[in-house]
């Protein structure tokens, strides 16, 4: 049981880390390369979000992450990206 809890914690930690890396990638992209209206920005964002959602789905299927925890990771990232997008479009 302890090993399963450790695996679940590791999975949640990794998914959260991946979400944070996506947020960082998008911040760097906006700071240095593109505007939120650029198709390249949208493509990178869509690809990264799709990949993270697949990671979450896989972890849920393996029983490493509760579906609700996975949704919360995605929701938190979407909210942060929305704030970031607003900040760059208001400038």
From Swiss-Prot:
Pfam families: DUF1507. Gene3D superfamilies: SO2669-like. Coiled coil: none annotated. It comes from the Bacteria. NCBIfam families: PRK13666.1. Belongs to the UPF0358 family. This is UPF0358 protein SAB0977.
């Amino acid at each position: 049981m302890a090993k399963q809890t450790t695996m679940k914690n590791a999975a949640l930690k990794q998914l959260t880390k991946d979400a944070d890396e996506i947020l960082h990638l998008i911040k760097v992209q906006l700071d240095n390369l593109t505007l939120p209206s650029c198709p390249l920005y949208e493509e990178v964002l869509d690809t990264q979000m799709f990949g993270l959602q697949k990671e979450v789905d896989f972890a849920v299927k393996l029983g490493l992450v509760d579906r609700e925890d996975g949704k919360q990771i995605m929701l938190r990232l979407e909210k942060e990206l929305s704030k970031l997008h607003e900040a760059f479009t208001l400038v």
